[in-house]
């Protein structure tokens, strides 16, 4: 398959690209640091990306910005960032990419388990993630030509915990998170949210 990955240079996007390129042609795109550049907050940037890459079999989004702050400190701008970048950015990635996807192709979006397992200080993130999941479920009922759409919901990532000086064993290594994206791309499911489950080993 020919697969376009958005956010391919990020903490999760990098291992996702590596895992998929073992058996597929991978096109890497990101805001910075890759040959193909795209800003999810800018619909015109998304249009330009699809014009450059042409037809693909799958689009994987591992991108989008959000803000984590206590509810009392959140501003309209904080909510707007996540809604414009992570939510509407991924919605537009689908809306503007339908014609670029081959018959039977797939969109894989990124939400997060905070949508259903909230924690203090992450209200804006939870709202954005829930929107991504709702969109994937609803859009699956309307996509033409056998196109599929799913959302992957990572939880705590070991490398992020380590950077925060927390126990990385409480999270899932990014290379393991990547396997859920591979499952979404290579599988047959649609309209699903795939939770990244921490390995018991």
What are these regions (language model features)?
Residues 29-45:
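Rossmann-fold cofactor-recognition segment
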Residues 40-56:
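Conserved Rossmann-fold cofactor-binding substructure of NAD(P)-dependent oxidoreductases
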Residues 82-83, 91-92, 106-132, 136-143, ...:
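Catalytic loop of short-chain dehydrogenase/reductase
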Residues 70-71, 78-80:
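Substrate-binding pocket helix/loop in short-chain dehydrogenase/reductase
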Residues 144-147, 151, 158-159, 164-201:
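C-terminal helical subdomain
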Residues 4-19:
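N-terminal Rossmann NAD(P)H-binding glycine-rich loop of SDR-like oxidoreductase domains
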């Amino acid at each position: 398959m020919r697969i376009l990955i958005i956010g391919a240079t990020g903490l999760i996007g990098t291992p996702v690209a590596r895992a998929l390129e073992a058996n597929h042609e991978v096109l890497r795109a990101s805001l910075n640091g890759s040959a193909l550049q795209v800003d999810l907050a800018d619909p015109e940037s998304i249009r330009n990306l699809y014009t450059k890459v042409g037809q693909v079999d799958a689009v994987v989004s591992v991108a989008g910005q959000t803000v984590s702050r206590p509810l009392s400190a959140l501003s309209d701008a904080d909510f707007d960032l996540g809604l414009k970048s992570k939510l509407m950015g991924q919605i537009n990635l689908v809306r503007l990419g339908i014609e670029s996807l081959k018959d039977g192709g797939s969109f894989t979006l990124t939400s997060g388990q905070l949508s259903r397992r909230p924690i203090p200080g992450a209200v804006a993130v939870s709202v954005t993630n829930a929107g991504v999941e709702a969109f994937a479920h609803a859009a699956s009922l309307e996509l033409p030509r056998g196109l599929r759409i799913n959302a992957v919901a990572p939880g705590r990532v070991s490398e992020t915990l380590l950077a925060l000086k927390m126990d990385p064993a409480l999270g899932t290594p990014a290379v393991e998170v990547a396997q859920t994206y591979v499952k979404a791309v290579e599988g047959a499911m649609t309209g699903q949210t795939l939770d990244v489950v921490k390995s018991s080993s």
